[in-house]
Regions:
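Short glycine/proline- and aromatic-enriched beta-strand/turn motifs that initiate or cap beta-hairpins
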Residues: 17-65, 225-227
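Predominantly the C-terminal beta-signal and adjacent terminal strand-loop region
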Residues: 172, 176-227
């Protein structure tokens, strides 16, 4: 997958290399719109109350991002970007405390999520060089999980635990604007880090979560934007 992405970017670089500037007046617009498609990979950072020889592990898989972009020009280098979208993902959370669980089904939790993800980001763009313009983005975001995320593991008989439906993040991204003949193409790589504990109400009699102090989401997005 990564090799295909790099090959695609090399093709875009070759196409956008020219002695003439494409879309010369594009950055003069105060407001521009676009859309993005991409892939994501979600992970979790678990902070424990006590050290454990059996940490929780996450089996990650790639998901899909799609969304819209609204970008407001603040000055020649700064832009404010609103990027609401739908992110779909699936991952397996594996509880490795074998002493507590006798059935394999009690240790594996398959989590499917569909998130409405809404970032508000500040974009700093470097000086344009021919048909290239690198940029950095940073900001905050929130997400709403459309799935009912409950800790329903293989008839455990205990009170189910729930993940938070709403989450908050900070985001950092790097990308390059390619000015092509008819549109601007903008690939980027983004790191997303949650600010909120996703399992806040642990009970001491729940073997799945009682040793968890904080359960935080981390993610990597590779987005391809078109304006």
């Amino acid at each position: 997958m990564l090799s295909r992405i790099l090959f695609f970017l090399l093709i875009c670089s070759h196409i956008s290399y020219s002695q003439f500037k494409n879309l010369q007046n594009f950055d003069e617009r105060d407001l521009r719109f676009g859309y993005y498609i991409g892939i994501n990979q979600y992970d979790n950072k678990v902070i424990y109350k006590n050290n454990t020889p059996y940490p929780i592990s996450v089996d990650r898989a790639e998901g899909i991002n799609v969304g819209l972009i609204g970008e407001l020009k603040l000055n020649k280098n700064l832009f404010l970007s609103l990027e609401p979208g739908l992110h779909a993902n699936k991952k397996n959370i594996i509880f490795n405390e074998r002493k507590e669980f006798t059935n394999y089904g009690d240790t594996l939790w398959v989590v499917k999520s569909n998130n409405i993800h809404i970032p508000l980001l500040l974009k700093y763009s470097a000086k344009r060089l021919d048909n290239f313009r690198p940029y950095l983005k940073a900001g905050l975001s929130t997400s709403i999980n459309l799935n009912e995320i409950e800790g329903t593991l293989s008839n455990n008989g205990l009170e189910n635990f729930k993940f938070e439906k709403f989450n908050f993040y900070y985001e950092l991204a790097f990308g390059v604007d390619f000015y092509l003949r008819y549109f601007k193409f903008s690939p980027s790589v983004r790191g997303v880090f949650s600010l909120k504990n996703e399992i806040p109400n642990n009970t001491p009699d729940n073997p799945w979560t009682r040793n968890i102090d904080k359960f935080l989401t981390r993610a990597i997005f590779i987005n391809f934007s078109f304006y």
